[in-house]
């Protein structure tokens, strides 16, 4: 669990550039003149770099108010009965008046009050001191909340400063502030689970931001599609290119019905013709109708064309041919055995039939 403490640090001397910028904290590891901090792991003191400085600037920006510069940190002692004239501001600065200079440190551009500027010009104050919370594990500075003009930067010990910090934000007072339960639930909805009594890690924060970015992108897509849908609904339909779906479905059904009727009629015509030509038996018709339904009229017609007509069937199934009297013609159909007998006897079919008729008398 991370622990936070409060630090106070002052430069060796108040140094103001010609353009009004002055150094608030040095770059890298640093400590107070009296050796503080004593509770940072490894004993390397407080620490600030460019990345930390960026967070400090954004932290000040999130306050939505200027940071106070007072005299001798009197704001931390206001509950001790100090007179009002000792609680006045010496100056102010905001996030836009903060600047990180690599290798040098964190600089601010204070807006001094006229009285403070005069006292600085007169040399009444020699140091600029900052009040900040820090991580006891790394020494990293966590926030800039107050600054002060002072002449005794090491006079205030940590115990005394901690006791006087009642008016600072919660982050300066609480070493272990539990995460807001609503925030924990929100992170869980984003797929980021933070254990109870634990701080959110940088990786978890990045995952939450990525999830929010994804939601934002998807929301943009939904908005774009909604706009296109609304536009399409308002636009008039070009009836030369589109027809109502009801009309299309009705036409499709009529076409299917007509096609089925046409196929049935064509199949019947093919079977009638084959039957008249003696290519099929009447008893085959039901089977052939089913076959035609499966393979199609064209395929069935091609198969029937290959079958040899049977003269007897043609004569029996025609409705127009007249069957001549057996007394006037010898035309008849012989069985296979009779045809074999004709060939064996060396006579014609007519002669065979005549012989057969005489035997039947």
Swiss-Prot record:
Principal localisation: host cell
SS bonds (residue pairs): none
Induction note: Expressed in the late phase of the viral replicative cycle. Expression of late genes is activated by the viral late transcription activator C.
Domain of life, source organism: Viruses
Cell location: Host cytoplasm
Role according to the record: Protease I is involved in virion assembly and maturation. Protease I cleaves the portal protein to yield mature procapsids competent for DNA packaging. Isoform scaffold protein Z probably helps the capsid proteins to assemble into a functional capsid.
Family membership: Belongs to the peptidase U35 family.
UniProt protein name: Protease I
């Amino acid at each position: 669990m991370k622990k936070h403490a409060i630090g106070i640090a002052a430069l060796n001397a108040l140094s103001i550039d010609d353009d009004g910028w002055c150094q608030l904290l040095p770059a890298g590891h640093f400590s107070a003149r009296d050796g503080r901090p004593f509770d940072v792991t490894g004993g390397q003191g407080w620490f600030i770099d460019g990345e930390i400085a960026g967070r400090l600037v954004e932290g000040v920006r999130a306050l939505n108010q200027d940071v106070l510069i007072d005299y001798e940190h009197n704001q931390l002692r206001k509950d001790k009965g100090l007179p009002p004239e000792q609680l006045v501001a010496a100056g102010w600065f905001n996030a836009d008046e903060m600047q990180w200079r690599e290798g040098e440190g964190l600089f601010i551009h204070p807006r001094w009050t006229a009285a403070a500027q005069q006292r600085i010009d007169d040399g009444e104050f020699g140091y600029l001191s900052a009040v900040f919370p820090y991580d006891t594990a790394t020494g990293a500075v966590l926030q800039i909340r107050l600054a002060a003009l002072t002449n005794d930067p090491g006079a205030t010990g940590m115990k005394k400063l901690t006791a006087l910090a009642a008016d600072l934000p919660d982050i300066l007072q609480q070493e272990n502030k539990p995460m807001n339960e609503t925030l924990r639930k929100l992170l869980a909805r984003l797929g980021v689970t933070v254990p109870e009594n634990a701080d959110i890690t940088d990786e978890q924060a990045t995952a939450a931001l990525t999830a929010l970015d994804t939601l934002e992108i998807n929301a943009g897509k939904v908005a774009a599609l909604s706009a296109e849908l609304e536009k399409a609904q308002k636009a008039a339909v070009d009836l030369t290119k589109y027809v109502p779906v009801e009309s299309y479905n009705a036409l499709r059904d009529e076409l299917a019905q007509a096609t089925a009727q046409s196929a049935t009629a064509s199949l019947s015509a093919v079977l009638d013709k084959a039957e008249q030509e003696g290519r099929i038996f009447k008893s085959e018709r039901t089977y052939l109708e089913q076959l035609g339904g499966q393979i199609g009229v064209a395929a069935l017609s091609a198969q029937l064309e290959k079958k040899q007509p049977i003269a007897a069937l043609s004569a029996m199934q025609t409705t127009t041919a007249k069957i001549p009297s057996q007394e006037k013609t010898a035309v008849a159909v012989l069985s296979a055995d009779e045809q074999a007998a004709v060939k064996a006897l060396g006579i014609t079919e007519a002669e065979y039939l005549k012989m057969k008729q005489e035997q039947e008398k």
